Structures are given as C-alpha cells and as structure tokens.
C-alpha cells in the first residue's frame, strides 16, 4: 500500500490505523522531504519514497493507494498503481481542485478502481466504529503538538512549515 502525502495528519492516521490491525502489511509513504523518513518509519511506514514536483521517484507499483495530494499528483498515481489496483483520492494537499482533460477510460484502462471519501459522509455509528477500532487495536492518536488559543498563529505557522508532521490541537483553555 502507498500513501501519497504520508506526513500529513491523514497520512499519519492511516499508518497508525492500518498498522494497528495489520502490522505486517507493507506500507510505503511519500514525502517531499526525506529528512522526515525516520519519523515516518517510527510510526509504521516501511518505505519512504521521495516525491518531487508531483512525481514519485520510483517506478514501483502498488495495489492500493491513498491519494492525499490530490488532482495535482493523481495522474502520476494512476501510473504507479498496479493493474486492478484501488486508488482512494480524499484530499487536496497539492492545492489543485480538479484534473484537466480527465479521460477515465484511457487513464483507468488497466482496470483501476478510483474511489473517494468525503468528511460529510460521517454518521454517529461510523464515528463510534472508529472510536471502537482505536480502542481495540490500541492506536496512538496523540497529536504532534498542542497549542493554546492565544498561540494559534504559531500553530498555523508550524503546520505551514517544512518541519510539521501530522496534526496539532489548539485548545481554548489556559492549561495544556
């Protein structure tokens, strides 16, 4: 399995959830910054692949891909997905909202499956199932950092910087 955008909050969450239940699954992740390789491996990634200008620096193909970079990288993802593979595109980290000149017959011609997830498709039942999964498999859900509300600018700067890793919490309280 491959996660494009592995250092994002969703990428880290996927790694922790997947490895919680299936610790032996080979999990590869992409990053534009290989300095984060040790952090990614510490949370369960087995392999880290450099992504440069929306192109993976490998010819390896994957059966399943979580596409978090989005339309700016998805054409490359199609080429990195094995025949019959599944791609779930569910984020727009690359800053592009659509794919120009998308031809599904041509681009998915190797019997690829393209699916998505939208955060509006959440119910009380689904959320409880996630909480139960986290408890059952002892998934680490700690955030990278916690800020106070008066530190919101610092939190935003951290997330936008090249050293960020995962998600942060901003609390509307004095106590951290």
Per-region residue spans from a language model:
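Mid-domain Rossmann-like dinucleotide-binding core that forms the NAD(H)/NADP(H) cofactor-binding site
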Residues: 1-52
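N-terminal Rossmann-like NAD(P) cofactor-binding module of classical short-chain dehydrogenase/reductase
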Residues: 2, 65-66, 88
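Short beta->alpha linker loops
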Residues: 7, 31-35, 51-54, 68-69, ...
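Short, well-ordered alpha-helical microsegments
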Residues: 11, 37, 73-75, 153
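Terminal peptide-recognition signature
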Residues: 18, 40, 65, 77, ...
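Glycine-rich phosphate-binding loop and adjacent beta-alpha segment
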Residues: 22, 40, 72-136, 172-176
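A short acidic, Gly/Pro-enriched loop at the edge of an enzyme's catalytic core
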Residues: 57-65
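C-terminal hydrophobic helical "lid"/dimerization subdomain
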Residues: 122-176
